[in-house]
Amino acid sequence: MSRLQNRFAELKAENRAALVTFVTAGDPDYATSLSILKGLPEAGADVIELGMPFTDPMADGPAIQLANIRALAGKQGMQQTLQMVREFRAGNQSTPLVLMGYYNPIFVYGVERFISDAKEAGVDGLIVVDLPPEHNDELCEPAQSAGLDFIRLTTPTTDDDRLPTVLAGSSGFVYYVSVAGVTGAGAATLDHVEEAVARLRRHTDLPVCIGFGIRTPEHAAEVAKRAEGAVVGSALIDKIAEAKSPQQAIDGVLGLCRELAEGVRGARR
């Protein structure tokens, strides 16, 4: 059983959803980012998505675009990101960690080398937003052969004809992008979320995690009543952008994470 399967099985037994947190590796700098990463599980993150910095994050809104700029300014490349995972894993063997981003940095690093190094570092899965299922043989299949989960994104515009293609080969969980647009955009209505989850469950037994637009503990709780996971990224990254010091960034992110975790954990009581 993979770490992701294990975590979602534990949460199902506890009758609660996962809090899935997204931060960009190296934002605002390596040391601060590593401190945030190490602190997230204790602050209540059940699954961590770690962004791989890229110069052209086209699916991301202003908050995550700026996070990428800050990380790249600090010379955060793929090697540094994988080293960060190794350092995280040295103290945490249980929290699933998924690398999220775009295909270009993986391609430049070398696909075989990336899969091997990611697995060795302790990565559990991948979300590659710009690699469609028609290209499964390029990364999805080799990654899964190596024991990495490959998590697909579905959107409000993914119709019933397209869904089986998107979900074929998916593992770990399904990431439902609840708003058509860029990350950090407005939140979806709860009725829409409910309908989307019901539709996805007709096509897959994988846990469904909802992302894009969740900013408050209250909203995270409402999503957690309806899906297996609530994904929060831009709201956490805003805390880094607003911080006047590294310690303030750490405290801001972990403080909000605790509040979100409280919302998610109390949702089904």
Curated annotation (Swiss-Prot):
Signal peptide bounds: none
Keywords for this protein: Amino-acid biosynthesis, Aromatic amino acid biosynthesis, Lyase, Tryptophan biosynthesis
Subunit comment: Tetramer of two alpha and two beta chains.
Coiled-coil spans in chain: none
Cellular component aspect of the GO annotation: cytosol
Gene3D superfamilies (UniProt xref): Aldolase class I
UniProt entry tagged with the keyword Nucleus: no
Keyword Ribosomal protein: no
Catalysed reaction equations from the record: (1S,2R)-1-C-(indol-3-yl)glycerol 3-phosphate + L-serine = D-glyceraldehyde 3-phosphate + L-tryptophan + H2O
Pathway of action: Amino-acid biosynthesis; L-tryptophan biosynthesis; L-tryptophan from chorismate: step 5/5
Enzyme class, spelled out: lyase
Species of origin: Ectopseudomonas mendocina (strain ymp) (Pseudomonas mendocina)
Official protein name in the record: Tryptophan synthase alpha chain
